[in-house]
Design a protein with these regions (language model features):
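Conserved alpha/beta enzyme-core scaffold
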Residues: 1-438
């Protein structure tokens, strides 16, 4: 049987597709933009047919309808990341969070530590050779498809076709549902004065020829905005967003000095707007690879002049970085922060640097501020990057390097880049903590 006949025979309605899910099954979604919205909606609509179905995924941009209390007998969320649609279920006790470094997710799948019965994913229509394309993600989704007992795909012609480990043959899919839904879009964040200042500070640490890892949001975009005069920048990053396009078009990013995959931007997933997805379509400069390769610290270390930029919710006097929890509440997940912090530290040329960039304070609705630089992390908070790995901390008030400093000097450097309104209080805490004058 040829692939075209296979495809036609396996086409079905969303309802028929989700009937392949059985009570007690474990279901994994495609990551981020590859979450098949039509199939997820059909699964929730079919909830009465299920009992004890476990849902697993990393970043989800959906509403997390399956986590609502009324579905507690039907679905249970056990995620490797918490987002807006899922963190409440974990907080309320009918969902769970599973800590794992992003680079290890495909490894866990292969070793059976993260097991599932059904993979639901979004793919492009098959090409003339019978291969569908993941388009915006290789991440763990590629491995999930290879390992699942049953694979259900929403076929969406809005997905771009990309180079790398993104091709899935029709024979590997058990059911196809054609539905051209709009792709999730994450509009560029507004860059304010604080983010601009942080971007300027970070830019002073980035030389011509650097290879960058950075994420999505106002701070990464602010950093990129300050790099348009740089030459021969490269990308080896867990993800990219729209801000990278401006630097490619300006000629600042051309990957010409990369020591690994010269001339290519290496990423594991995309998250942005239609502009980014159009940029990615059939673009040989952009290559998507699984996260156990892209985020593998040993692979990251092969890039000369490597710079990683990540964020934090809190940093204490010792340099401990909290990026995925607020006290005892799980807020997100580790993502690739530690993967890249460690990879950069292992860089073979000895020039890699990692930056944790964040506003100095969080502003509450009533206008009061909470310092992100604190003597101690909050009770119950989980350390993301530990004090032995942390390198640079950047706020709008400056740069504090942690490596090469004892604990007192680390605390002094951090207090000097804290918000001016909290510095005196932090100095008092310093005296209490270290029995020494500031």
């Amino acid at each position: 049987m040829g692939w075209k006949e296979t495809y036609e025979n396996r086409k079905c309605t969303p309802q028929d597709a989700v009937n392949l899910i059985k009570s007690g099954d474990r279901v994994i979604f495609g990551h981020c933009i590859c979450e098949p919205t039509v199939l997820v909606d059909a699964m929730v609509a079919n909830a009465d047919a299920y009992r004890d179905v476990t849902i697993t995924h990393m970043v989800s941009l959906g509403t997390g309808e399956y986590t609502k209390p009324e579905y507690k007998d039907n679905f249970r969320f056990e995620g490797i990341f918490c987002g807006a649609g899922t963190r409440k279920s974990v907080e309320q006790g009918h969902g769970d969070f599973m800590p794992v470094y992003f680079n290890e997710v495909p490894v866990w799948i292969r070793r059976g530590l993260l097991n599932f019965d059904v993979c639901m994913v979004m793919l492009s229509p098959p090409n003339e050779k019978g291969y569908c394309n993941l388009g915006v993600e290789s991440g763990y989704t590629y491995q999930a498809i290879k390992s699942a007992k049953t694979v259900i795909a929403q076929i969406n012609s809005n997905l771009p076709s990309t180079y790398g480990d993104t091709c899935i043959h029709v024979d590997e899919i058990d059911a196809f549902v054609e539905a051209d839904t709009p792709l999730f879009e994450s509009a560029p964040a507004k860059i304010g004065e604080v983010e601009t200042a942080i971007g300027k500070h970070c830019a002073t640490l980035i030389e011509d020829g650097a290879t960058l890892q950075l994420g999505i949001g106002a701070i990464p975009d602010a950093v990129l905005a300050e790099l348009k005069d740089r030459k021969n920048l490269g990308i080896h990053s867990e993800m990219i967003a729209d801000g990278v396009i401006d630097l490619v078009e300006a000629g600042a990013i051309n990957c010409s000095e990369k020591t690994l995959h010269n001339g290519k931007m290496i990423v594991t997933f995309l998250m942005g707007t239609k502009r980014l997805y159009d940029f990615a379509h059939n673009n040989p400069m952009l290559v998507l690879k699984p996260v156990d390769y892209v985020n593998n610290p040993a692979v990251v270390a092969k890039n000369n002049n490597m710079v990683s930029i990540n964020s934090a919710l809190q940093v204490d006097f010792m340099g401990q970085v909290v990026a995925c929890s607020i006290g005892t509440k799980q807020f997100s997940g580790v993502g690739g922060q530690v993967d890249f912090v460690r990879g950069v530290a292992m860089a073979e040329d000895g020039k890699g640097i990692s930056i944790i960039a964040m506003p100095s304070v969080t502003k509450k609705k009533d206008g009061t501020i909470i310092s992100k630089i604190t003597p101690y992390i909050d009770h119950g908070a989980a350390v993301t990057t530990n004090r032995y790995d942390v390198d640079y901390i950047v706020t709008e008030y400056g740069i504090a390097r942690m490596k090469g400093k004892n604990l007192k000097d680390r605390a002094r450097a951090l207090i000097n880049i804290a918000h001016p309104d909290v510095r005196e209080g932090l100095k008092d805490e310093f005296a209490n903590r270290f029995n020494a004058a500031f």
